[in-house]
Amino acid sequence: MKHVGFTKFLDFTAQTGSAKAASALAAFYQSGNMQNSRTHYYENLREALITAERSGKYTDWEDFIREQKEEAQEATRDALIKFYKWKSNYVSAAWYEPPKQIWALQEFDVNINPELGLILDGEVHAIKLYINNKKLSDLKAQAAGLIMENMFHEQYPSIKFAILDVKAEKFHVFNGASERLDYLLIGEAAHMSAILSAAKQRAVA
């Protein structure tokens, strides 16, 4: 069983043509390889923000910025400013541990893992952090919300599911989607399964 990241699956849903196949094949060859020498700055920042919000102990962000590669320091500072600007829109923000679950499909599974569990002004949110430099389209934002809704709503009916596009300063709270998007996600999951199955067969041929 191959393991595909939540964000990588969202990228796959929005791609077309050869880029779509390349995305699935990258998942095939990278699955299970936890040693990634090309860790991007936003992955470090994501983990630091989760730790800070969970503990309530805010780090010295200037020290954190200086620890990043020089070419990533400006982008890291910009993302931090935008994150805390967004958070300042709320009078209160309390942490809770957000739900997580594996979405098991035919040839792969996806770790559905909203990183931030925040009670914002009394409303419980499970939030997927998006700090990537790639544009977050409305389709990907809706798809993320629908996947989380499908996975968690029955057990956690009071939670609002959202994706925070830090760079664009947009907070996408899922408020429902058309039946067509549900069918689209089923089709995209089947499409990725078909590509991964073909890659597996070719690898053993």
Regions found by a protein language model. Give the residues of each.
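Compact mixed alphabeta submodule
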Residues: 138-139, 153
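Short beta-strand-loop-alpha-helix junction that forms the active-site gateway
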Residues: 129-138
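Flexible, glycine/threonine-enriched loop-and-boundary segments that flank and lead into catalytic domains
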Residues: 99-105
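Active-site beta-strand-loop-beta-strand hairpin of nuclease catalytic cores
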Residues: 107-126
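Well-ordered, non-membrane alpha-helical segments in soluble/globular domains
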Residues: 44-45, 140-148, 185-192
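Metal-dependent nuclease catalytic regions and adjoining charged, substrate-binding loops involved
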Residues: 153-205
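A structured, charge-rich N-terminal accessory region that forms the first stable segment of a protein
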Residues: 1-72
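Acidic-basic catalytic patches of nuclease active cores, encompassing PD-(D/E)XK
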Residues: 67-98
